């Protein structure tokens, strides 16, 4: 654990050299949750300054291709949340503005397939 132990975050991670955001998302979700996804579109981009480092968070709407049974590889817990439940967990500061927007305005349209 570290400074943010016990906080919630979107699954994902850093883009490696030679990857685009969609390739990075696929790799990270296989590494973290053992699922393959079909990235549909970028929903949001947020820049956040944690003081000691700056990050760009890219939220991508996607459908699950395989691995419907999610395996927690790098995380302790996972939850599906309804719009009403979005703010019920302790989100990392970079993620919170996106969740507050979805809580107030509604979730992005999810892909049907």
Residue ranges and their predicted role:
Residues 2-3, 52-54, 73, 93:
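A generic fold-level signal
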Residues 69-113:
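Nudix hydrolase/Nudix homology domain
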Residues 36, 45-69, 77-79, 83, ...:
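Active-site-adjacent beta-strand/loop module that shapes the phosphate/pyrophosphate-binding cleft
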Residues 22, 56-57, 95, 99:
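A general structural signal for well-ordered alpha-helical segments in protein cores
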Residues 1-31:
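Conserved Nudix-box catalytic region and its N-terminal flanking loop in Nudix hydrolases
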Residues 32-39:
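Short secondary-structure junctions
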């Amino acid at each position: 654990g570290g400074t943010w132990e016990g906080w919630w975050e979107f699954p994902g991670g850093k883009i490696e050299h030679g990857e685009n955001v969609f390739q990075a998302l696929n790799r990270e979700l296989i590494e973290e949750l053992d699922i393959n996804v079909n990235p549909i579109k970028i929903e949001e981009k947020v820049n956040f300054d944690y003081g000691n480092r700056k990050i760009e968070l890219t939220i991508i709407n996607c459908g699950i291709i395989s691995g419907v049974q999610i395996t927690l590889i790098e995380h302790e817990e996972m939850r599906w949340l309804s719009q009403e439940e979005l703010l019920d967990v302790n989100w990392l500061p970079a993620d919170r503005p996106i969740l507050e927007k979805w809580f107030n305005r509604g979730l992005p349209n999810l892909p049907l397939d």
